[in-house]
From Swiss-Prot:
The gene is rpsO. The lineage of its organism: Bacteria, Bacillati, Bacillota, Bacilli, Lactobacillales. SMART domains: Ribosomal_S15. Gene3D superfamilies: 6.10.250.3130, S15/NS1, RNA-binding. PANTHER family: RIBOSOMAL PROTEIN S15, BACTERIAL AND ORGANELLAR, SMALL RIBOSOMAL SUBUNIT PROTEIN US15M. GO terms for biological process: translation. Part of the 30S ribosomal subunit. Forms a bridge to the 50S subunit in the 70S ribosome, contacting the 23S rRNA. It holds the Pfam family Ribosomal_S15. This is Small ribosomal subunit protein uS15. Belongs to the universal ribosomal protein uS15 family. One of its GO terms (cellular component) is cytosolic small ribosomal subunit. Coiled coil: none annotated. It comes from Latilactobacillus sakei subsp. sakei (strain 23K).
Length: 89
């Protein structure tokens, strides 16, 4: 369900805007996307795990808010991020 710390560090290093960047919108969105994808795999096997489903919905809402913030403040970074993460079709 949860992503490993090593995987999380890989994502942070890939999407960080500068050295030591762990809190930018891009990094937060990328980490949330990995966690959501992990929960999708878990929920496809454990369909009755409602607690994890609620947690997934909260993560999706948080990611949606961060994406809206990024879109409103820097459309170019938003477009690059959704393209690299494959969020929109």
């Amino acid at each position: 369900m949860a992503i490993s710390q090593a995987r999380k560090n890989e994502i942070i290093n890939e999407y960080a805007r500068h050295e030591g960047d762990t809190g930018s919108a891009e990094v937060q969105i990328a980490v949330l996307t990995a966690e959501i994808n992990s929960l999708n795999e878990h929920l496809s096997v454990h369909k009755k795990d409602h607690h994890s489903y609620v947690g997934q919905m909260k993560k999706i809402g948080h990611r949606r808010n961060l994406l809206r913030y990024l879109r409103d403040n820097d459309i170019q970074r938003y477009r690059e991020l959704i393209k690299s993460l494959g969020l929109r079709r």
